[in-house]
């Protein structure tokens, strides 16, 4: 069969003509290999660039259960585009997934990322992946693979989207599922580093209304840097705590805030009563509430309000847990207690 004839003056088309630059993709791989190499740990059986990534479950596990999580960064990326600040969203991406699998007692083992854009900017993508690798280092997990998708016409110039995938392992007998939580247990709150990666659609609406100078000083750093502070990763201090005492339950405070995430680990019939005066509301959340006219109840169901992770322990273990986490560099408060629910009551109430 003869190929179709083209017009005499027609030029042959290339993938680059269609908007996809294979050379740019290759250049990105070369740039990110050193970042990924720094995250290598026992169990990694291959390098970046293969069709699939190989990982051997550590032999220390007798009955390993794999725990997986996936997430993105949400509309925090829109603020990153506006500020042309791409160095922190990679850590956000890792944190959202590794903190999620941590609450079941899992040690993060490896991470993969997906970077999608309309036109690939190698420097921007490399900056993002460098942040992802940093997040993996903070989590003790390996960055073993990923996908960069350049899709002309799918995203505006200068914009991209991210997705991350984490896999960890926990000993079957040590899975944390909240089943042992009972009345009298104590809820500890670990400080967040800021807004983390949830609620940014409301944040952006408040910024639109208030029209602040994002470069202005805000309690020692620019408002922009305060808003973009990367999500805190709690993996290492909490894995260490689990080796010393019984952690009955944990809740990563993400979308839905304190009042919708803590109930996810409570059995029916139990309520966590939180004292909103037990920890300080950070200045950034006060600023958001003031400039947005946001009600207290809405703040508690949208933002973390200064608490990025809730940890539930027996009352007898609370002081030891606080001391251990404080020594590891965390700010911790007793923010509430678990009790029997009253009729018709929500499973988490803030008083």
Swiss-Prot record:
Organism from which the protein derives: Burkholderia vietnamiensis (strain G4 / LMG 22486)
EC number: 6.3.3.1
Chief place of localization: cytoplasm
Family label: Belongs to the AIR synthase family.
UniProt GO molecular function: ATP binding; phosphoribosylamine-glycine ligase activity; phosphoribosylformylglycinamidine cyclo-ligase activity
Record keywords, A-Z: ATP-binding, Cytoplasm, Ligase, Nucleotide-binding, Purine biosynthesis
Name by which UniProt lists this protein: Phosphoribosylformylglycinamidine cyclo-ligase
InterPro entries the record matches: PurM-like_C_dom (IPR010918), PurM-like_C_sf (IPR036676), PurM-like_N (IPR016188), PurM-like_N_sf (IPR036921), PurM_cligase (IPR004733)
Taxonomic lineage: Bacteria, Pseudomonadati, Pseudomonadota, Betaproteobacteria, Burkholderiales
Cellular compartments annotated: Cytoplasm
